[in-house]
């Protein structure tokens, strides 16, 4: 499969202008990553769609994991498509070093060997032509950052990996489903991420689910100034996919882990 690098770079420039009124040389690494990722997603869309259609009504395999560590997708995806060197050269010709994106955070969807193992299974399957789809949760804070306070104590900080956008996933609202627990109902919204096989001929899918509150904004509660209730309800629903492996030393923590494993 051949992908047009000039088109990808042109689309990246157009997206930078449209979204940020910037150019390749005036933008930030985060914005460049976001727009380049979107341009690549545009380029692979036909192949991704064809891969899905070719496997309709055929036997498929599914991989379930609590976590996935997919690595730096801008590099791995361009490499698997066979255009990493060409994109690097095209950016350099316009005064941009692709290495500037090396500090872009990985998708924080895991924190250990289990996540890397899951990613390796997906990579191996798609490169071998096996129709394997991955399923899991789309954590907002899958990992955490660490720092030391003034007393030298280690502190954990949230790692909001989607703060600058997530160009490698598509939200699929039409496939959202209700998940009913004994004491609450949430909406599970899927986000699809392409898993590109080496050579770019086949693309599988990693579908990650994000927990959200059902229904629309509660204006009645807002008008009566029950803002704490609104916030509490939101966190209770969205908290299921907030973080990987919540503290299970309390009853609430154990219940949250149970919800995650059954969602």
Segments the model singles out, each with a brief description of its role:
Residues 1-263:
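A conserved ligand/cofactor-binding region detector
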């Amino acid at each position: 499969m051949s992908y047009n690098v000039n088109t990808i770079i042109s689309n990246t420039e157009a997206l930078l202008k449209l979204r940020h009124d910037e150019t390749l040389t005036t933008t930030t690494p985060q914005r460049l990553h976001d727009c380049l990722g979107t341009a690549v997603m545009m380029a692979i869309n036909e192949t991704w769609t064809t891969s899905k259609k070719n496997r309709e009504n055929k036997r498929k395999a599914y991989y379930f994991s609590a976590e996935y560590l997919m690595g730096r997708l801008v590099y791995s995806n361009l490499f698997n498509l066979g255009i990493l060197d060409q994109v690097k050269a095209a950016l350099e010709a316009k005064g941009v070093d692709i290495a500037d994106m090396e500090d872009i955070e990985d998708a924080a969807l895991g924190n250990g060997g289990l996540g890397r193992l899951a990613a390796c299974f997906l990579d191996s399957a798609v490169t071998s032509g096996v129709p394997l789809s991955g399923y899991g949760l789309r954590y907002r804070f899958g990992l955490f950052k660490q720092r030391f306070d003034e007393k030298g104590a280690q502190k954990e900080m949230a790692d909001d990996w989607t703060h600058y956008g997530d160009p490698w996933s598509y939200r699929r609202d039409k496939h959202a489903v209700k998940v009913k627990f004994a004491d609450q109902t949430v909406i599970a919204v899927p986000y699809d991420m392409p898993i590109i096989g080496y050579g770019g001929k086949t693309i599988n899918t990693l579908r990650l689910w994000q927990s959200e509150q059902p229904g629309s904004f509660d204006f009645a509660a807002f008008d009566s100034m029950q803002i704490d209730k609104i916030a509490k309800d939101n966190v209770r629903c969205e908290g299921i996919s907030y973080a990987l492996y919540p503290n299970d030393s309390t009853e609430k923590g154990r219940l949250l882990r149970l919800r995650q494993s059954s969602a």
